[in-house]
Amino acid sequence: MTSFKLVKYTPRIKKKKSGLRKLARKVPTDRLLKFERVFKAQKRIHMSVFKVQRVLDEIRWRYYEETVMILNLMPYRASYPILKLVYSAAANATHYRDFDKANLFITKAEVSRSTIMNKFRPRARGRSSPIKKTMCHITIVLNIVKKSK
């Protein structure tokens, strides 16, 4: 007979790779001004979180002008509300904070789930089936980058 040893199982926790590594490749972190940022959020957009997420993954850690160009050329329906949101955030940055649009950089672009609107569709024999309309919240953070000397 073989004997078994009882060992307490401890799961391995994978460390999340921070987004600053990506950022360091494009913009050195010492050039990124920490507290010079503009937040803009849009709530209750009638779109799935997953559809918005694939567009936000493309524009995260990019400059403003490059982001606008990418969003104009994307074939997805989610790119239009995100484009409006980025335009609005950049307009707020130039109007209220006197930032230059050429130095704006998207440091955070995230989407979160909102409420689900339930409707009912009439079906055969007096039955009904639910229609679930999902909504989401989008948050964009624009940061200013110092000019390199």
From Swiss-Prot:
<dbReference type="InterPro" id="IPR036394">
    <property type="entry name" value="Ribosomal_uL22_sf"/>
</dbReference>
<keyword id="KW-0694">RNA-binding</keyword>
<keyword id="KW-0687">Ribonucleoprotein</keyword>
<dbReference type="GO" id="GO:0003735">
    <property type="term" value="F:structural constituent of ribosome"/>
</dbReference>
<comment type="subunit">
    <text>Part of the 50S ribosomal subunit.</text>
</comment>
<dbReference type="Pfam" id="PF00237">
    <property type="entry name" value="Ribosomal_L22"/>
</dbReference>
<protein>
    <recommendedName>
        <fullName>Large ribosomal subunit protein uL22c</fullName>
    </recommendedName>
</protein>
<keyword id="KW-0150">Chloroplast</keyword>
<comment type="function">
    <text>This protein binds specifically to 23S rRNA.</text>
</comment>
<dbReference type="GO" id="GO:0006412">
    <property type="term" value="P:translation"/>
</dbReference>
<dbReference type="InterPro" id="IPR047867">
    <property type="entry name" value="Ribosomal_uL22_bac/org-type"/>
</dbReference>
<keyword id="KW-0699">rRNA-binding</keyword>
<comment type="similarity">
    <text>Belongs to the universal ribosomal protein uL22 family.</text>
</comment>
<keyword id="KW-0689">Ribosomal protein</keyword>
<comment type="function">
    <text>The globular domain of the protein is located near the polypeptide exit tunnel on the outside of the subunit, while an extended beta-hairpin is found that lines the wall of the exit tunnel in the center of the 70S ribosome.</text>
</comment>
<dbReference type="GO" id="GO:0015934">
    <property type="term" value="C:large ribosomal subunit"/>
</dbReference>
<dbReference type="InterPro" id="IPR001063">
    <property type="entry name" value="Ribosomal_uL22"/>
</dbReference>
<dbReference type="InterPro" id="IPR018260">
    <property type="entry name" value="Ribosomal_uL22_CS"/>
</dbReference>
<dbReference type="GO" id="GO:0009507">
    <property type="term" value="C:chloroplast"/>
</dbReference>
<keyword id="KW-0934">Plastid</keyword>
<dbReference type="GO" id="GO:0009536">
    <property type="term" value="C:plastid"/>
</dbReference>
<dbReference type="InterPro" id="IPR005727">
    <property type="entry name" value="Ribosomal_uL22_bac/chlpt-type"/>
</dbReference>
<dbReference type="GO" id="GO:0019843">
    <property type="term" value="F:rRNA binding"/>
</dbReference>
